[in-house]
Amino acid sequence: MFRWENFTTANGLPDNHVFCVLVDGDRVWTGTDNGLGLFENGKWRSFRPNPDAKEHSLAHQAVLSLALDKNTGDVWAGTMGGLSRISAGRIDTYTQLNSGLSNDIVYGVGVQGDYLWTATAAGASRLNIRTGQWSLYNAFNTPMYEIWTYAVSPSEDKVYYAVWGGGVLEYDQKTERWKDYNDPDGETEMVVMKDQGLIHEITTSLSYVDKILWVATYFGASRYDGRYWHNFLKKDSGMPSNFLSQIKAIDANRAWFSTDKGLAYFDGTNWAVYRPALDTHQPEMYITDVAGNSKKEIPVKTAPSHNYILGVDFQGDDIWVATAHGLSHGIRENNSVAKR
């Protein structure tokens, strides 16, 4: 169980529409529709494009994605107008004009070792942070039949891309080969074969943890262990909706699901949902079994600021939540149902 405190423009947030959130130790970064926000020592600071600074200010005011380079402490921000790196107070911006970035609309960013991976509206890019060399990946050198890459999850052995309308792409770091995963029934309007493969082609997010791949789509979610697929739908799970913006795994069995009708947590056995009630807008929390049955309402006094959830990140036992109207901080209480 969490006690929720919420942030909007009324108490310092750059904009109420929050696309993403990134925890950086004691600091919290948030990408909004009107600037990059930094919450530190109880205060907000905002970063926006400065026409006079050119390549040394934020690329665009709409910040879609964030990633932390744990080796350097740098923060990378994907925006609607390029890629920006925030390093010790200095901002450097990369666009199609001054770098090897494949497109200026950067939906996803991820750092693994010396490499920064980006998901853009026209394919994927990889930057060797140490040498400055760029590599481009698109329909010409990968099985990417749609080039709208929406999210990326890099790890030491694999890099996974969510391709909007094109399923999932897997890059093997050792062999440098690509592989694609798609909806086996090819049916965009319904699920014909539930656990035979990826639930749907329109993928929005993925999370690769403990050799398990979790995938979010607009029509449900999938879990893949390298051999078997298991898919989640509202009708046979505790998800409040099939429309997902993000999925973020904790380990092989536990994950958080960001949907348009609330924030859901699955621990491998039970589900917990946090949201303002869809009808009364009052704080609501409930738990169900693995199939979404045996629903039990839990009395709560607080909830995330909006039911439309776009993403989460973790700060110890706490959780930070990006929503369509504000940023929420879930402070875990001792009798918590959902444990990190």
Regions found by a protein language model. Give the residues of each.
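Carboxylate-rich, polar loop motifs that coordinate divalent cations or form catalytic acidic clusters
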Residues: 1-340
